[in-house]
Curated annotation (Swiss-Prot):
Species name: Neurospora crassa (strain ATCC 24698 / 74-OR23-1A / CBS 708.71 / DSM 1257 / FGSC 987)
Induction line: Repressed by thiamine, but not by thiazole. Induced by various stress conditions, including heat, cold or osmotic shock.
Gene3D superfamilies: 6.10.250.2840, FAD/NAD(P)-binding domain
Family of this protein: Belongs to the THI4 family.
Protein name: Thiamine thiazole synthase
Amino acid sequence: MSPSVLEPQSVPTLVNVGLKAVGRNDAPVERDARGLSKPLLELMPTLGTDAFTFSPIRESTVSRAMTRRYFADLDAHAETDIVIVGAGSCGLSAAYVLSTLRPDLRITIVEAGVAPGGGAWLGGQLFSAMVMRKPADVFLDEVGVPYEDEGDYVVVKHAALFTSTVLSKVLQRPNVKLFNATTVEDLITRKHHAESSSSSDDGEAEDEAKVRIAGVVTNWTLVSMHHDDQSCMDPNTINAPVIISTTGHDGPFGAFSVKRLVSMKQMERLNGMRGLDMQSAEDAIVNNTREIVPGLIVGGMELSEIDGANRMGPTFGAMALSGVKAAHEAIRVFDLRKAQNDKC
């Protein structure tokens, strides 16, 4: 097995997200020789008989159980530490690393689709297998996804195995909340002031026109899709000192943040994703994952629209490791951005 990508020097205190801790039964489950638990085996013969019935419930109980928790999450994450825009392979990988290394941080994932995972449920041309070039196998080892080792690359038997594994691990973290079927409609901005009149501690030049990203503007995806035929559907907001945008290459919701930077005059133009070149594309995406403007880190294929990088097609190693790099960058700049964000 390859060494872990995660080497935390200390384990910070777990963040309190506003709800009571999730109850878990960590006691070992008794199983028979066939592998099923004793309670399930005892239940099976009753299914379809008069002896089987669910516990009683009233419809309003279900409504309140969902509503209470969702609005508690909205309240808890209105002010968060890190927002990840887009829950594809890059965004989920970033969420995994962040929530592991910094359990003290509140991490909010905003995904436009009902189903998280982006394009990582299948390989190329709707085929099942997922190919990752080494050293991305290190991340597969980290999350426990099995694969076939083919020398310079590895093959996961079904892309959904990777996505569902990372997704399940991320969603179990108490400091992570996923808001799916929710889109980011805009970015919250503040005028960016460098630390001195010439440059800041991290080398940022003073520029009166420069902005710092201080959160995201959200709405239900279905509402966002109908702004042209309905009126007065104002959004909601989430404040955060660091945003990681991993919305993919240009498309209906793709490359959203970087396109918005152009319209806000923070970038002159996008260079546009180039044609497919697996050899150069993956290195470029991982190595150039970075903070584009203060408070906004861009990773994955969204980055290709800024840099004019090649697309890599159906090989996914760069998506996973770009997420790892994005998490590393977020941790690196977090204290500075939080200090700036707390001033306003």
